[in-house]
């Protein structure tokens, strides 16, 4: 039976880079954001309900979701954000669970869930939580470099996410990603050895058990 580690962290912490390091070591990887994207891609099963709730203005003339428009709408309104989450979160949960069922031989796998701290229903899908942490200034710099967002825009996103202390309280393990990619790879290799050992002998190891 494959045991699942939930990998989480704030924007710019290096979640995806860490998850890729694990994947490079042969660890099964599931990405909640990728699942969400597939659900809202062309002919995605979430689209009819999104259209019903948000209207035609969030779609282009080809029927594709205008993600930028929808993102602005939900970012500006907590009630609209909650409405979108009521559609998306159950579908993402089901998609992750379906993907998990395709892996049975690996000792453990990684599920990348950015909002794990905020959306605790996903805890039931995992046995252990790995939080990727980084200094705020590094996080802001990384996001600005890759996205073109201003410092203020990145800071606004961070302010809407769970705090670092909240993530650390949830964590079984913490990886501090404050250096180079080489350093990140070395840290994930050590965690890989640790997880391979504990899950081979104690598959329920961790504080997030059924």
UniProtKB/Swiss-Prot annotation:
It catalyses: 3'-dephospho-CoA + ATP = ADP + CoA + H(+). It is found in: Cytoplasm. The keyword Glycoprotein does not apply. InterPro entries: Depp_CoAkinase (IPR001977), P-loop_NTPase (IPR027417). Gene3D superfamilies: P-loop containing nucleotide triphosphate hydrolases. GO terms for biological process: coenzyme A biosynthetic process. GO terms for molecular function: ATP binding; dephospho-CoA kinase activity. It is an enzyme of class 2 (transferase). Keywords: ATP-binding, Coenzyme A biosynthesis, Cytoplasm, Kinase, Nucleotide-binding, Transferase. Pathway: Cofactor biosynthesis; coenzyme A biosynthesis; CoA from (R)-pantothenate: step 5/5. Its EC number is 2.7.1.24. Residues 4-202 form the DPCK domain. The keyword DNA damage does not apply. ATP binds at residues 12-17. GO terms for cellular component: cytoplasm. Its main location: cytoplasm. Belongs to the CoaE family. Catalyzes the phosphorylation of the 3'-hydroxyl group of dephosphocoenzyme A to form coenzyme A. This is Dephospho-CoA kinase. The gene is coaE.
């Amino acid at each position: 039976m494959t045991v699942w580690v939930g990998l989480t962290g704030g924007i710019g912490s290096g979640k995806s880079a860490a998850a890729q390091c694990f994947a490079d070591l042969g660890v099964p990887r599931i990405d909640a954001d990728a699942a969400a994207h597939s659900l809202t891609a062309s002919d995605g099963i979430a689209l009819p309900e999104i259209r019903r709730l948000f209207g035609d203005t969030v779609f282009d003339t080809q029927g594709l979701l205008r993600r930028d428009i929808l993102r602005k709408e939900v970012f500006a309104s907590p009630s609209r954000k909650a409405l979108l989450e009521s559609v998306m979160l159950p579908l993402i949960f089901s998609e992750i669970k379906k993907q998990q069922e395709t892996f049975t031989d690996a000792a453990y796998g990684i599920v990348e869930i950015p909002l794990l701290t905020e959306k605790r229903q996903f805890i039931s899908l995992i046995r252990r939580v790995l939080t990727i942490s980084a200094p705020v200034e590094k996080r802001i710099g990384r996001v600005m470099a890759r996205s073109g967002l201003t410092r203020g825009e990145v800071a606004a996103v961070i302010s809407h996410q769970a705090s670092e202390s909240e993530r650390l309280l949830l964590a079984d393990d913490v990886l501090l990603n404050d250096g180079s990619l080489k350093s990140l790879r070395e840290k994930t290799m050590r965690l890989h050895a640790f997880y391979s050992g504990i899950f081979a002998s104690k598959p329920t190891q961790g504080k997030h058990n059924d």
